[in-house]
From Swiss-Prot:
Record bears the keyword Hydrolase: yes
Active-site residues, Swiss-Prot/TrEMBL: 607, 670 (proton donor)
UniProt cofactor note: Binds 1 zinc ion per subunit.
Species name: Mus musculus
Listed EC numbers: 3.4.24.71
Protein's UniProt keywords contain Ribosomal protein: no
Primary localization: membrane
Protein name: Endothelin-converting enzyme 1
Extracellular side: 89-769
């Protein structure tokens, strides 16, 4: 505590009351050293012994001595009372109010988002976001809207300016991104070509029975081409990534795939999803007609067969909540063993074709996620008519590539999106579509332009400091856990210490020569949008295949710099924060740190906690999947997490329950991230002193921290989009990301004085980290 120099303290000093002042300042020493009969310099004797001897001493006093003792006692008591009052005044004194333009602006934004008529102890999400929700209905052309969307819109506008500015590019790779974007914007040329580019591609691949004759014996060839050259994944997905059990090497990985709809649930719960299934079939028929299929009566039965085949795939697909234990689903086999497991595919020719020029032999290691799925999909392929198999593979190609064609295909997409996600049809500016597609495919190529335009030089250092504070806070909490044994705790701390931070962008993109080297084999052609997209699919697979004989590289990010997101990589044990998210509302230099810790601080804590969620905890500090926990702590962890499974499973949206097991990892990260960020903010205040408060709000800085956290998640969704999120998204709905985390926080309840048993302060709370 800082010394307070008040007018009363000055007056006491001026009175020359040296004896009393000295006694007060040395009070602790006096109590420790006094014994019976100790005498002070003023001749006053004080005795702490038995009351009987004290009574005898008092009786022996003269009346003058007695009056002096009483007077001294009263004066001492008065002084103590004054000092106590000063201390209370200091403790409760309201910090100064920040009245800068930035503080007034952020206050206005906070107030506009809030609904102060809602009791924060009843429903904090509505209290924090009620005003925002009323002012932000889902915009036309969207199925959901939130603070992330606002920031992405801002980033899109920046990217548009850069792509349209010829002087913004320095490297050849950046210029390729600009050529790609301009080709997308050339609607005149796209409308001239109509469906011709895709129809020619279909013919080149042997035809499609829906639009014309097809080559009847080309199953293996078609599968190889659509997988490698056009990045589709019929039946299963094949990719290259770090080996979970040997993270220093890359390995071929095979997993379940092949559904046209976002989840198996859409196919299997037919009554609930009848509208979507009908809309999907109509969409399939419409694309078939646009590609020259002719009579709808001839197209619809064949499209229904494709839909039925996808339903059969959905039946053998493993639900996501049953795939969370990676130790159980990881299987390493050889190419020869894979051939025995799934004989419907000629695996060696298939792998040698898609990974050319890398040579694959029978001993090639391959990681398979879920052997039973591959066994059953092989049987399904063998038992299915060849014409239907070809129709299905070509449908995968059409579904992936039709959006690069003329407006008729865009209209068909929009009509299905309205059924699927509740998206209202609207005339979204073409540039937004083209910016998104260019960023999605060539985000690293345009990355340097975006970084130079938006990312301040010291942002990496500031973000690094915040990450360091969050790590420290997480490790402090780790040291207090009662359910974890000491050996596992030490290993967990080592893992936390070893987490690598990647901030803003991968270093190679800022070196024009290095960037050009990466994109050297990709060529964008002026005014041929479809061709450019197909070339990119082929190029991106070649880049993937090229990694097979190389070691994993930290500079290979899974997100581009403009992305408004962040992630944790278990095999690299690293957390990644693209430049796109290091902006308001997550971080602003001029905002109180309560908001910054509640924003980007919680994001950092969230990603850090992923290293210790139900999946991340299975990886050690070097990124290897192995059992490094003692069994007692594994069982205790499962007990702690079961609480969260039950808690979140009790939440529902429009009468549909949240899947607490499917969302477990994200819920652990949300709760752990909030706790770590709050603790880090308290450490910051201890080090730097209390912050200025914001005007009008009447909130303390601690309350502002929780409010800032909640307002990051203000969002709205259509009912259709909410349904899709509940069955596909590993994150809980935004409302419950706020309510679930805060209702588990004792500190939140204390700062908002929520009565025990109130909705935001339940008696039973869940805590893992």
């Amino acid at each position: 505590m800082r010394t307070v120099w008040s007018p009363l303290a000055a007056a006491l000093a001026a009175l020359g009351m040296s004896t009393y002042k000295r006694a007060t300042l040395d009070e602790e020493d006096l109590v420790d050293s006094l014994s019976e009969g100790d005498v002070y310099p003023n001749g006053l004797q004080v005795n702490f012994r038995s009351s009987r001897s004290g009574q005898r001493c008092w009786a022996a006093r003269t009346s003058v001595e007695k009056r002096l003792v009483v007077l001294v006692t009263l004066l001492a008591a008065g002084l103590v009372a004054c000092l106590a009052a000063l201390g209370i005044q200091y403790q409760t004194r309201t910090p100064p109010v920040c009245l800068t333009e930035a503080c007034v602006s952020v206050t206005s934004s906070i107030l506009n988002s809030m609904d102060p008529t809602v009791d924060p102890c009843q429903d904090f999400f509505s209290y924090a976001c009620g005003g925002w929700i009323k002012a932000n209905p889902v915009p036309d052309g969207h199925s959901r809207w939130g603070t992330f969307s606002n920031l992405w819109e801002h980033n899109q506008a920046v990217i548009k300016h850069l792509l349209e500015n010829a002087t913004a590019s320095v490297s050849e790779a950046e210029r390729k991104a600009q050529v790609y974007y301009r080709a997308c914007m050339n609607e005149t040329r796209i409308e001239e070509l109509r469906a011709k580019p895709l129809m020619e591609l279909i013919e080149k691949l042997g035809g499609w029975n829906i639009t014309g004759p097809w080559a009847k014996d080309n199953f293996q060839d078609t599968l190889q081409v659509v997988t490698a050259h056009y990045r589709t994944s019929p039946f299963f997905s094949v990719y290259v990534s770090a080996d979970s059990k040997n993270s220093n090497s890359n390995v071929i990985q095979v997993d379940q795939s092949g559904l046209g709809l976002p989840s198996r649930d859409y196919y299997l719960n037919k009554t609930e999803n009848e509208k979507v299934l009908t809309g999907y079939l109509n969409y399939m028929v419409q694309l078939g007609k646009l590609l020259g299929g002719g009579d709808e009566d001839a197209i619809r039965p064949q499209m229904q067969q494709i839909l039925d085949f996808e339903t059969a795939l959905a039946n053998i697909t493993i639900p996501q909540e049953k795939r969370r234990d990676e130790e159980l689903i990881y299987h390493k086999v050889t190419a020869a063993e894979l051939q025995t497991l799934a004989p419907a595919i000629n695996w060696l020719p298939f792998l040698n074709t898609i990974f050319y020029p890398v040579e694959i032999n029978e001993s090639e290691p391959i990681v398979v996620y879920d052997k039973e799925y591959l066994r059953q999909v092989s049987t399904l392929i063998n038992n299915t008519d060849k014409c239907l198999l070809n129709n299905y593979m070509m449908w995968n190609l059409v579904r992936k590539t039709s959006s690069f064609l003329d407006q008729r295909f865009q209209d068909a997409d929009e009509k299905f999106m309205e059924v699927m996600y509740g998206t209202k049809k609207t005339c979204i500016p073409r540039w937004k579509f083209c910016v998104s597609d260019t960023e999605n495919n060539l985000g690293f190529a345009l990355g340097p332009m975006f970084v130079k335009a938006t990312f301040a030089e010291d942002s990496k250092n500031i973000a690094s400091e915040i990450i360091m504070e969050i790590k420290k806070a997480f490790e402090e909490s780790l040291s207090t856990l009662k359910w974890m044994d000491e050996e596992t705790r030490r290993s967990a701390k080592e893992k936390a210490d070893a987490i690598y931070n990647m901030i803003g962008y991968p270093n190679f993109i800022m070196d024009p020569k290095e960037l050009d080297k990466v994109f050297n084999d990709y060529t964008a052609v002026p005014d041929l949008y479809f061709e450019n997209a197909m070339r990119f699919f082929n190029f991106s697979w070649r880049v993937t295949a090229d990694q097979l004989r190389k070691a994993p590289n930290r500079d290979q990010w899974s997100m581009t710099p403009p992305m408004v997101n962040a992630y944790y990589s278990p095999t690299k044990n690293e957390i990644v924060f693209p430049a796109g998210i290091l902006q308001a509302p997550f971080y602003t230099r001029s905002s109180p740190n309560a908001l910054n810790f509640g924003g980007i601080g919680v994001v950092v804590g969230h990603e850090l906690t992923h290293a210790f969620d139900d999946q991340g905890r299975e990886y050690d500090k070097d990124g290897n999947l192995r059992p490094w926990w003692k069994n007692s702590s594994v069982e205790a962890f499962k007990q702690q997490t079961e609480c969260m499974v039950q808690q979140y499973s009790n939440y529902s949206v429009n009468g549909e329950p949240v899947n607490g097991r499917h969302t477990l990892g994200e819920n652990i990260a949300d709760n752990g991230g909030l706790k770590a960020a709050y603790r880090a903010y308290q450490n910051w205040v201890k080090k730097n002193g209390a912050e200025q408060t914001l005007p009008t709000l009447g909130l303390t800085s601690n309350q502002l921290f929780f409010l800032g956290f909640a307002q990051v998640w203000c969002s709205v969704r259509t009912p259709e989009s909410s349904h899709e999120g509940l069955i596909t998204d590993p994150h809980s709905p935004s409302r419950f990301r706020v309510i679930g985390s805060l209702s588990n926080s004792k500190e939140f309840s204390e700062h908002f004085r929520c009565p025990p048993g109130s909705p935001m302060n339940p008696h039973h709370k869940c805590e893992v980290w």
